[in-house]
């Protein structure tokens, strides 16, 4: 079979002298680093030179000069992070020179967005070298994900602050006074003062747990301070006129309550944060606080002064410059990787343009995929630029009656659910849950509460366990960290008990018994439930220091374990906000696409029982999981740890038969089948939002008992059929993988505008690969296999579809990560045994040619050319099928996405229409755009005639289409939302599409899509 050729780029010269000289110049002349740091950077460059040469075409634009600059940045950042850690451990002493990531990027003329887009390749490909030089824990010490999360959070918070400032204060170009220049300068200074005071609050008061919700409260507290200190003439609102302010009797407006109403904040929490901000003003700026009730100033007119603090001359035009200098110095003294002041300077090229994926940060919002970092050219034209909407009048607050949802506002709304629904619950099992716990073979209430305390303490440690992550200089920091951790533990614990009780009730209904001993005494089940509860709390507050999969590492479970409870968790908590449901769904998708296939996954412990033929390869690759650390070991770690990694530090393991073993480990080879536990997965959907499109019969069926999902793999399946629990679990797991692959294949087919036959062939090919060449997915991403399946089917079908086109369209998929096609894992030892020498990770074209095709060629040949023979189809059509109807697809049922394309040739879209919407949407002028099942599209016709007419129109593209639906490729798509705007908008879209198509000349073979906004 013909091989696809990877692009050729000039390698780094063998001696690398020119590159080393360039790196040395940057270290010595630009960054002024000391000799030891320069030597360390040169050593790391020398060790990774071979990797750099092999990665030239995959980094940045592929030019040697740009690739070198990126590689230098990766090396300097690694040396900075890892050598500083060495100094802290007392192993070495670095020089007096201090540098951070922003200085590195400025020296190399790179921006933060591009740096973090390319960094994962360096982490993957140079990981072995970094491990040899800096130790096995180098990745945790590098903190690349934490710094990226910090950048994303600051981008969101700066926009949140900018938006709030513009709502309450005038923009400088809206001031038409004679001294407009001075007024503009003051407003800019006030804007900068607020941001610097927020950074001081964030660095001093939120040192370790810089979560988005707490920081959002910090932004709101800064707005409160600005409102009562900025002169009234700069306000963009009138307290007396605004309906959004909460009035407190005759005393005036309750400012804190009003801000909580506007921003969905907690009044108690906001008052605490305001007090901390006031303390910083007193400590750093040396301003004397006074109770607002004792001050006479027009800034407090019509505002209830109770509980407010006022600082004389804090933001007067004569003193603000001095305050700015003091805050700048305070910020400079607190060293960090990012210069967080740049986020209010829209002209700073360091921020970069484009978007940075927030997947690692799990930022949820109104859309599943969010451009967390928009282009500064659009967003930061001016920090105080006026609203573009004509509705933005002088009274900015009353004019903006409903703010559009943002990631920050969504986080605040979700936190409100925790505050109002979960927090009022008792932090112990309810009487209903206690009934189930006491109905077991013995009363296990104490066991459940003790486990919850230990596991949640491990996930949310006190400051003594996490001091190495801290910053800031004020003594109240540790106390606030401990309070924050205790609040999060309580929230997770209450949520855990609430959902556990609901699950027990459902399980008792299925089993017709209250004794759930098998489930409730299972250690792994409870840890999965606690991890899921804690992850929801972390996702709500969006922390920087505890990103997923932190809950897996700290509880001792694996990705495969957690995937067993996610869908059931969603099902049994009805009040769960939509954004948290989406988070769990996307998390399950992330687990299934790659994490369950990683080395050390407990999935392999079931796979060698269900598929004994794979046991040898699994053992040779060292893929099996280690036993799960015991609860006593985790408890001892909490009591004596100095903050080290939980998973890697635990030595004691469970030996009791009732405690299910298995934690991810790249080192242990477990060959005792009797120790393999916990692998039955009884859930039906990998991604509930997208894949829970089951038929009515299936949706009414009771789910299998939960306890069977956590039974020993070698145990016979209680449901019968002669299978072990491992075989049943792997079959269900493969079904979920196939469903996830079906959705992604369907999305790619629509983007590439391929036929239904190609879609079915790609899906069948993937099914065969999963079932018969399962090892191709070991330590890889399922998208890598899907992309190879597309190209393989294209070649066997003699289609003119290149890998370049496939990857180009894959980039537009919401789940796309460049690392998927730039870095595919290959077993270097196996390659050497076969006489090939190469790196551990290669690009997808090399993987396709050297690994994929040799393994699947017999399967691909079986598919044969994809035929579109109408005669064959007619001879084999099912009995009773309507003449001319397309054949029934073997492709699995996927969700009804609105609108859904049903033809690869014509622009035909189908959107589900509820009966409640029909009368409102379908008027006489728009009815012809819809074909409703059971309702005729023409007078005096039957539904069967309508269906036949639709088939004839689809199958006869040359017929006269007078007064019929327009199926031309240039016709505009009509969706539900467009119908409400009547025919004018539809005709405009058709004319626009037609002019675009006619002006484009030759049509491009690839489908063009609008970019995400």
UniProtKB/Swiss-Prot annotation:
Major location category of this protein: nucleus
Renumbered residue ranges of the record's region Spacer: 608-727
Modification(s) after translation: Highly phosphorylated by CDKA-1 during G1 to S phase transition. Once hyper-phosphorylated, becomes inactive and unable to interact with E2F. Ubiquitinated. Subject to proteasome-dependent degradation during sucrose starvation.
Entry annotated with the keyword Ubl conjugation: yes
Pfam entry (one): RB_A
Chain residue ranges for the region called Pocket: 406-858
Keyword Nucleus in annotation: yes
Family that this chain belongs to: Belongs to the retinoblastoma protein (RB) family.
Name under which the protein is recorded: Retinoblastoma-related protein 1
Chain's gene name: RBR1
